[in-house]
C-alpha cells in the first residue's frame, strides 16, 4: 500500500458532506480575530517583554510576517480546495497520506494544548474578577496541581467549566457558534480600544530606552533561556495561532473561494496592528524589567501603574472574553480536522458522526471537549505550551512547501486566489518558520519527537489499514486483476 497516495481536488470536494453553510466574510474575520487576539495580549506580553524589552513590538511584527506569508499559502489552498481539514487536507492533496496524517495528528495536539493552556489563563483572570467583587473560590479549585509552587491547588474548576460550556455551544450548531463568537469579539475589540485610548497618555518614552536591550539573539549569564527579538517572537508566535482554523470552516462557508481568503487576511491584518500598538503602549507605561511582577497578568499590571482602577474590571472582562473566543476557535478547528480524518478512515467513524438536527460532528466535538477540559483541569500544562508553537510552525512549513509543489505539478488547477510572489512567498514563509523554531528550547523538540513517534504508531497500527483511499485503490486493483483473469 502506498504511504504517499494522494487525493485530487475533485476527490476532496466530492467527499465533503452537507454541513450547514452560513459563514460570510464578516463571520470568518471575527472567527480569525477571535482565535488570534486573547492570550497574546493578556498573558504572553509579560514574558515577551522580559525576553526582548520594548523591542517586543518588533517580535510581534516578525511573528506576524511569518504568519502573513504562511497565511497567503493557506489562502491559496483554501480557495483551491474549500473543505474541512485545513493543513491536513492540503497535505493530503500535495504530499500524500502519511504526511497528511502526521500534520493532522500534530494539529490535534496543537488545538487541544492551546485550548487547555488558555483555560488556565482564563481561570486566573476569572479569579481576579471575582476578587474585585469580594468573592473567592476555594484556593484548591483555582488551578491544576503543581501550577503554583507557593500554593496548594488540585483542580482548575473555572477552566474546566468554561471548556465544557464552549463545547456545548460548538455541538449545537454553527449558527450559535458564529453568533456567540461575533458578539464576544466585538466586545473584546471595544475593550482593547478603550484600554489604548486611556493608557496612551501614561506612556513615558524614556521607558523605551534601550529599545532592544538583548539584541537579536543572546544568552544571559546563568540562564539557559535565550533572550532577544527572535526568542520573544518564538514565544509570542503563540498569539497568532488560530488564523489557520479559519480554513477549517470551508464546508460551512458561503462562497468559500472568495470569503475564506478575505477572512484569513483581514483577521491577520487587524490583529497585527492591535498587537503592535498594545505592546508599544505597555512597555511605554511600565519599564520592561518590572513585568516580572506582572508575569501572569501584564495588562492588569499596566492598569495598576496608571492608577485607573476603574478600568481593571473592564479589562479583566475583556481578557475573559478574549480568551473564551480563542478556546472556542481552537476547539472548533480541532473537531473539524478530526471529522475530516474520520471521513478518510484514518480515525474511527465515531469522530465523523454528524448530528441529524444540529449538522455538527457532535460526538467528536464532545470527546475532545471533555478531554481538553480534564487536561486543563487536572494537569499543569504551562510547561507544554511551546509544543503548540513547534506543531503549528511544522504545519506552516508543510502548507508553504505544498504551494511550491502544487504550482509545479498542477499549474493549471483552478484557483480562486493565487498567493502573490510565488515562489518567493512560500520560501520566505518556510525560512521565517525555521527561524522561529530555532528560538524554541530543546525540551520542546524532545516532547514533539515523542508525540510524532506516537502518531506513527497509530498510523501504521490502525490508520493505514483502514484508509478509505487505500481500500478504494485496493478494490480497484483487485477488480483489474479479476478482469484480467477472466
Please describe what each predicted stretch is.
Residues 20, 43-148, 227, 267-270, ...:
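Extracellular loop-to-transmembrane helix junctions
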Amino acid at each position: 500500500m502506498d504511504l504517499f497516495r494522494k487525493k485530487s481536488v475533485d476527490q476532496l470536494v466530492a467527499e465533503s458532506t452537507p454541513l450547514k453553510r452560513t459563514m460570510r466574510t464578516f463571520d470568518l474575520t471575527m472567527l480569525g480575530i477571535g482565535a488570534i487576539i486573547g492570550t497574546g495580549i493578556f498573558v504572553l506580553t509579560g514574558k515577551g517583554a522580559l525576553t526582548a524589552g520594548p523591542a517586543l513590538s518588533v517580535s510581534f511584527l516578525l511573528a506576524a510576517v511569518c504568519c502573513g506569508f504562511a497565511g497567503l499559502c493557506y489562502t491559496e489552498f483554501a480557495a483551491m480546495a474549500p473543505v474541512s481539514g485545513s493543513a491536513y487536507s492540503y497535505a493530503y492533496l500535495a504530499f500524500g497520506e502519511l504526511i497528511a496524517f502526521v500534520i493532522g495528528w500534530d494539529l490535534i495536539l496543537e488545538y487541544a494544548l492551546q485550548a487547555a493552556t488558555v483555560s488556565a489563563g482564563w481561570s486566573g483572570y476569572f479569579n481576579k474578577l471575582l476578587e474585585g467583587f469580594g468573592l473567592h473560590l476555594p484556593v484548591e479549585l483555582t488551578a491544576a496541581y503543581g501550577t503554583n509552587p507557593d500554593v496548594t491547588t488540585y483542580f482548575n474548576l473555572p477552566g474546566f467549566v468554561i471548556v465544557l460550556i464552549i463545547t456545548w455551544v460548538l455541538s449545537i450548531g454553527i449558527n450559535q457558534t458564529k453568533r456567540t463568537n461575533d458578539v464576544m469579539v466585538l466586545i473584546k475589540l471595544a475593550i482593547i480600544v478603550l484600554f489604548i485610548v486611556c493608557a496612551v497618555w501614561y506612556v513615558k518614552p524614556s521607558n523605551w530606552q534601550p529599545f532592544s536591550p538583548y539584541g537579536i539573539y543572546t544568552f544571559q549569564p546563568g540562564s539557559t533561556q535565550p533572550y532577544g527579538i527572535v526568542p520573544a517572537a518564538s514565544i509570542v508566535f503563540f498569539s497568532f495561532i488560530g488564523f489557520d482554523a479559519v480554513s477549517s470552516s470551508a464546508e460551512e462557508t458561503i462562497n468559500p473561494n472568495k470569503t475564506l481568503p478575505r477572512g484569513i487576511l483581514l483577521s491577520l491584518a487587524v490583529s497585527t496592528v492591535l498587537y503592535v500598538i498594545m505592546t508599544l503602549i505597555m512597555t511605554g507605561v511600565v519599564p520592561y524589567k518590572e513585568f516580572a511582577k506582572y508575569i501572569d497578568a501584564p495588562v492588569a499590571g499596566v492598569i495598576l501603574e496608571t492608577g485607573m482602577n476603574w478600568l481593571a474590571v473592564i479589562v479583566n472582562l475583556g481578557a475573559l472574553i478574549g480568551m473564551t473566543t480563542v478556546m472556542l476557535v481552537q476547539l472548533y478547528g480541532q473537531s473539524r480536522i478530526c471529522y475530516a480524518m474520520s471521513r478518510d478512515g484514518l480515525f474511527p467513524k465515531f469522530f465523523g458522526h454528524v448530528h441529524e438536527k444540529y449538522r455538527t460532528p457532535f460526538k467528536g466535538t464532545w470527546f475532545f471537549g471533555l478531554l481538553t477540559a480534564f487536561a486543563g483541569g487536572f494537569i499543569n500544562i504551562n510547561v507544554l505550551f511551546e509544543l503548540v508553537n513547534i506543531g503549528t510552525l511544522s504545519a506552516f512549513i508543510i502548507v508553504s512547501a505544498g504551494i511550491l509543489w502544487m504550482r509545479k505539478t498542477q499549474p493549471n488547477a483552478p484557483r480562486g486566489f493565487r498567493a502573490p510572489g510565488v515562489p518567493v512567498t512560500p520560501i520566505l514563509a518556510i525560512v521565517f518558520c525555521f527561524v522561529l523554531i530555532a528560538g524554541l528550547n530543546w525540551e520542546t523538540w524532545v516532547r514533539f519527537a515523542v508525540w510524532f513517534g506516537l502518531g506513527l504508531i497509530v498510523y501504521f497500527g490502525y490508520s493505514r489499514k483502514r484508509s478509505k483511499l487505500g481500500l478504494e485503490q485496493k478494490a480497484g486493483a483487485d477488480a483489474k486483476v479479476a478482469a484480467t483473469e477472466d
